[in-house]
Amino acid sequence: MPFRFIVSSALLLLSSVCLAQGPAPAISYTRDIQPIFTEKCVACHACYDSACQLNLGSGEGASRGASKIPVYDGERSKAQAPTRLFYDATGQRAWQQKGFYSVLDAQGSQAALMARMLELGHRTPLQPNAKLPSEIALGLSRENMCPQPAEFDAYAGAHPKEGMPLAVTGLTDQQYLTLQRWLASGAPIDEQGLAPSARESLQVAQWENLLNAPGARESLVARWLYEHLFLAHLYFEGGEPGHFFQWVRSRTPSGQPIDLINTRRPNDDPGTQVYYRLWPVQGVIVHKTHITYPLSAAKMARVKTLFYSGDWQVTALPGYGPARRANPFETFEAIPAKARYQFMLDNAEYFVRTFIRGPVCRGQIATDVIRDNFWALFQAPEHDLYITDPAYRGQATPLLAMPGQNDDVGSVLSLWLAYRDKRNEYEALRRDSYADSPAPSWSTLWAGNDNALLSIFRHFDSASVTKGLIGEVPQTMWLFDYPLLERTYYQLAVNFDVFGNVSHQAQTRLYFDLIRNGAEQNFLRLMPAGTREDFLDDWYQNSGKFKMWLDYESIDCLLYTSDAADEGLGV
């Protein structure tokens, strides 16, 4: 019998003796249990890729339990019902109606599923600092068994070394005993939701007043801001450490409890009057979803300056629906394009992070679209024809619609070809229009703050974004203008449905490939004209050359840059 099992048995016996002498102190979920989950479990049991959808970052997630249905599935023919924690159901019964089953409840004379999983792991501990047994499969692509309580015995027999925590040295004896005592007592959860401090409450009210101000112009700006900040973990100037908030749509106004409008996408029809509310982020903070954005007096002043300083008007508020989702340039055309672009430039690191670290970029299929390392630059608004030339903007806007709204599996090819051709028509329009403009140079790049230069690093099946140009000059660079930055954000963050079917996901990722190509071609226009074909030949080799011929609009190799740009970057 392993020494560790003997020790834990002795401790369990000792705790029983102590219990006979007097009641042990009550175990608190918040004080005693969540810290164990945070230290030992959330690395695998958080976010959409929680094993078996068992999210142990909060009491709500632990109570919700597990499901055999994975969130990430690039082959399903029908979209599945969303199962976003805190959004799509509340309480154990509601989640069980969506296919979840308890891991905390005892089953007759049998202990809770979690207790049995922990016991299996504790009974067969792994040797520290030794190679894992070959029979333990790991990785994002591993097939999780997700046994229900009645299936546990069969699971334990087939996978005797795959108790919990999986493939690590596991819990300390004290942690194990604490969890088992808690489960044996019925797994009570005393977790209280985070609440804003008095100072935060004042700032919450100020921001909610701004986004819920009356008037058509105010309503349109609020909708645009919400759609651009819904993923952010917001924090206040002078706020409490560890307190973050997120924008949500509610049926109730400020001052009343939030009645969440939980549509699949942030730009779906709410079906009722909308109030934009700030909701405290609940549960353990994990890196994958922690894309931060500060709220301050300076930020509010900047929003007011950008969006409310002009005399532009809204004649009619746009509705909702597939066409409105597909083309935000038409949906929000009443808002000055310069204001929209400048807001995104001011916060470029945040926006690039939303689509580089968001749900669309989980797994090799998505990150295969991008290269291992590249730099991102941005075109200055005063040199962006979409901002400065209303006639060009009017021609370009209908061509900027994005696919993915129609998820009919049988129509994937025809939809893809239609949107590819529309995108290439836009690229031809852009190429010809810029040919009549002053030659581009490095001075046409935006350099307004420290968001102006970004480095992106791909780590096989995930990616990260950092300010500054880091490392040696990469093989490729991306140059965003407003139409490209906005399309990237909407295609990969706003409109992407992680619960969508194979058609939706394929259209999204195929268009992402066109986005990458467009950003690379934008950058090449800064290079000496005679060198562009050589760069393309280096960037697109083997099957890439066929793809260039089949899907991409050709690069302009005749339009010369200014003398300053012809000096190049030494790439």
Q: What kind of feature is each model-predicted range?
A:
Residues 1-10:
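Bacterial N-terminal signal peptides that target proteins for export
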Residues 18-20:
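Boundary at the C-terminal end of the N-terminal hydrophobic targeting segment
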Residues 22-34, 38-170, 196-218, 222, ...:
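Solvent-exposed helix-loop boundary motif
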Residues 106, 241-363, 367:
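Extended alpha-helical scaffolding regions
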Residues 162, 169, 173-178, 190:
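Soluble extramembrane regions of membrane proteins in the secretory/endomembrane system
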Residues 310-470:
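Extended, compositionally biased alpha-helical segments that mediate assembly or anchoring
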Residues 560-567:
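Conserved small/polar residues in nucleotide/adenosyl-binding loops
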